[in-house]
Amino acid sequence: MPVAAYILIQAELGMSSSVAESLSRVDGVKMAHPVTGVYDVIAFVEVSDLAKLSSLVLKEIQTVKGVQRTHTAIAV
């Protein structure tokens, strides 16, 4: 069953745009935008299952230069 989620990202100071740009090139990330507020970037992702979501967040998103913290909200 496909899984869709929003990844809320806190980035290093001045890195929001480059983080969003880097994330937009990651397979599974449908869109990523710098935003204002508590989080600096919001990404929308779609993957085939929860295991792939976990891998995407831990191995692809959290390793992008400038990413400090992530919070994942799975769409229901």
Q: What positions do the PLM features span?
A:
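A compositional/biophysical signature of low hydrophobicity enriched in polar/charged and small residues
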Residues: 1-76
